[in-house]
Amino acid sequence: MDLKQIEKLMIAMGRNKMKRIAIKRDGFELELERDTGPNIQEPVFYDNRLFAGFTQERPIPSDQNLGNPIVKEVGEKKEDKPVEGDFIVSPLVGTFYGAPSPESPAFVKPGDIVSEDTVVCIVEAMKVMNEVKAGMAGRVEEVLITNGDPVQFGSKLFRIVKA
């Protein structure tokens, strides 16, 4: 095997993303190993249906606007009224379900009175259904998330006015 053949073999290794090759033929041995740099995890791809309910707060500028400033008109700022009540938050990352099954009625709805031990929803994490209890007594004022939406640890699920 001459130098040209070895160079072609190295190019083929790069094209095919091979890390190592060993050749033994007629008393000739050749072993090539590529240093691929640090071990970087492959990108993770998510099913877009999981994020269908999310909206993007700020638009991503297109290639045409990269050199130009983005001008945004600002109207009158509305006074934010303080929100009355406390919040029930998600104790873990998962998927929010407001009912035990699709055919069942919701655990709670606005206007319902709950105690500390009342189950208000289920958060599914890794195929395990975890019941979320109110943790406080009061009246449900608002359901802040839609059935089937993903939730993060600490996401606000319900607004409660303590009794």
Swiss-Prot record:
Which molecular-function annotation in GO is an example for this chain?
acetyl-CoA carboxylase activity
User: Which key words tag this protein in UniProt?
Assistant: Biotin, Fatty acid biosynthesis, Fatty acid metabolism, Lipid biosynthesis, Lipid metabolism
- Please give the residue positions where the record annotates the modification N6-biotinyllysine: 127
Query: By its UniProt entry, which Gene3D superfamilies does this protein fall under?
Result: 2.40.50.100
Q: Which biological pathway?
A: Lipid metabolism; fatty acid biosynthesis
**Recorded superkingdom:** Bacteria
Give every Biotinyl-binding domain span.
Answer: 85-161
A UniProt-annotated Pfam family: Biotin_lipoyl
Tell whether Lipid metabolism is among the UniProt keywords: yes
According to its UniProt entry, the protein's GO biological process terms are: fatty acid biosynthetic process
Q: Which InterPro entries match?
A: AcCoA_biotinCC, Biotin_BS, Biotin_Carboxyl_Carrier/Decarb, Biotin_lipoyl, Single_hybrid_motif
Q: Which GO terms describe its cellular component?
A: acetyl-CoA carboxylase complex
Which SUPFAM superfamilies does the record associate with it? Answer: Single hybrid motif
The entry describes its oligomerization and partners as:
Homodimer.
So what does this one do?
This protein is a component of the acetyl coenzyme A carboxylase complex; first, biotin carboxylase catalyzes the carboxylation of the carrier protein and then the transcarboxylase transfers the carboxyl group to form malonyl-CoA.
Q: What is this protein called?
A: Biotin carboxyl carrier protein of acetyl-CoA carboxylase
Q: Which organism is it from?
A: Chlamydia muridarum (strain MoPn / Nigg)
Query: What phylogenetic lineage does the species belong to?
Result: Bacteria, Pseudomonadati, Chlamydiota, Chlamydiia, Chlamydiales
- Which gene is this protein's source? accB
